[in-house]
């Protein structure tokens, strides 16, 4: 008979969640809750949904304190009630002209919405958590994610600002959702007479997506229309894009002609820095390109009006490319 004791199995441990895991849980919970808000128009349904979606997060918090399953449920319910009202009041509803349908949160002495019959301040409202940071463009993007592509033109029809649309489109472009960006932004440029410089970012993003989708005719048509805009910033945006198009096909003379016209219209536009260095690089004038890049990086770094970090990084990259080609 073997007298040796059998080895004991290690106790099961709770998986360790990273900050990224927690962010993923929250992001998925928020995204799905927005869908419930749009579909149900029922705060109770949103609370019930969030209670389930946030249970893993509640379990993590409670288990760290040696809590019980009942305490996990109470924690999940408390999170759900607080977050449901904040999400509700920040969610732009398509049928409400992409504005939230505001709903007053429970008063501190009112019965708690969870049904406990206790006062809100003694139940789900007992925490000291600060308000969520829910940027309007992020919430608009969450709502649009629940709409079919055929409805992505609705924000333009409802008067959502070009700046807001550009913020959403920029994220989608980073995610390579080019067709969604085109569906979102194309309606904005049907009537350029209504637009001013606030639409310039959206125009550049749309032209980038046309390029990514190899829709050259659509891009070139937008360039020509921008060049005829009554707004000098939009005209400059069209000319700057024309300069890159001409450079790509080896038309050096017209590339510089378009660049100089754009510079005349908007001499303080930081994006001219990158374009000038690109044109010099395209001609193989690498020494001049490095000199102009150094000049522009100093100018951009000293500019108090704009956050030029992305442009400076892009210029650094162009200089590095030029050095690698030597």
Where are these regions (language model features)?
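Acidic/negatively charged segments and metal-coordination signatures
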Residues: 1-326
């Amino acid at each position: 008979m073997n007298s040796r004791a059998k080895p004991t199995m290690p106790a099961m441990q709770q998986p360790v969640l990273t900050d990224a895991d927690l962010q993923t849980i929250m992001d998925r919970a928020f995204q799905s809750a927005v869908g419930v808000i749009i579909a149900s128009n029922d705060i109770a349904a949103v609370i019930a949904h969030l209670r389930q979606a946030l249970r893993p997060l509640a379990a993590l918090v409670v288990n760290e304190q040696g809590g019980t399953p009942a305490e996990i449920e109470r924690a999940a319910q408390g999170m759900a009630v607080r977050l449901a009202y904040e999400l509700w009041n920040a969610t732009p509803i398509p049928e409400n002209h992409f504005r939230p349908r505001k709903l007053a949160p429970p008063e501190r002495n009112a019965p708690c919405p969870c049904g406990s019959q206790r006062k809100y301040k003694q139940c789900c409202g007992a925490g000291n958590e600060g308000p969520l940071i829910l940027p309007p463009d992020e919430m608009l993007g969450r709502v649009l994610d629940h709409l079919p592509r055929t409805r992505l033109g609705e924000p333009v029809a409802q008067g959502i600002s070009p700046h807001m649309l550009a913020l959403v489109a920029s994220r989608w472009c980073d995610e390579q959702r080019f067709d969604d960006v085109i569906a979102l932004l194309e309606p904005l440029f049907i009537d350029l007479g209504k637009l001013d410089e606030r639409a310039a970012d959206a125009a550049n993003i749309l032209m980038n997506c046309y390029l990514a989708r190899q829709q050259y005719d659509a891009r070139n048509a937008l360039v020509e229309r921008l060049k005829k805009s009554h707004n000098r910033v939009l005209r400059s945006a069209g000319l700057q894009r024309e300069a890159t198009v001409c450079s790509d096909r080896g038309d050096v003379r017209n590339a510089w002609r378009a660049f100089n016209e754009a510079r005349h219209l908007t001499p303080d536009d930081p994006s001219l820095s990158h374009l000038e260095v690109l044109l010099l690089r395209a001609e193989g004038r690498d020494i001049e390109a490095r000199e102009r890049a150094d000049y522009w990086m100093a100018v951009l770094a000293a500019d108090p009006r704009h956050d030029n970090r992305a442009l400076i990084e892009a210029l650094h990259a162009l200089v590095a490319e030029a050095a690698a080609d030597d």
